[in-house]
UniProtKB/Swiss-Prot annotation:
Name the record gives this protein: Alpha-lactalbumin
InterPro entries: Glyco_hydro_22, Glyco_hydro_22_CS, Glyco_hydro_22_lys, Lysozyme-like_dom_sf
Tissue-specificity statement: Mammary gland specific. Secreted in milk.
Organismal lineage: Eukaryota, Metazoa, Chordata, Craniata, Vertebrata
Binding site for Ca(2+): 84, 87, 89, 92-93
Organism: Tachyglossus aculeatus aculeatus (Southeast Australian short-beaked echidna)
Amino acid sequence: KVFEKCELSQMLKANGLDGFQGITLEEWICIAFHESGFDSRALNYYNGSSSHGLFQINRQYWCDGQDAKSTEPSVNACQISCDKLRDDDIEDDIKCVKKILKESQGITAWEAWQPFCIADLDQWKC
């Protein structure tokens, strides 16, 4: 599903992501746009691993699934199938995002954040 900006904003807010670990809703909307174009089914390959869903969560560390381009086992820290990160239900994606924020390198885990989502966030407001 490709979400509309404000539809996604409402869902992220309803699931407690606004202000979580100090990250604003506008930053999350910006990240989702630059990572996946708001597409919950996005699948990309980079550096021999796959990234999944709205937030492009990486298989190597966070989810479990077969990856044709990598034989390395997944850590599966979010205890979720990568396929579940590419469906229309993003509540489980948000739980994984929160885990990444708390247990990993925080918001810098998302490469889109620093170059695109620190300043001038007005376009991401609803």
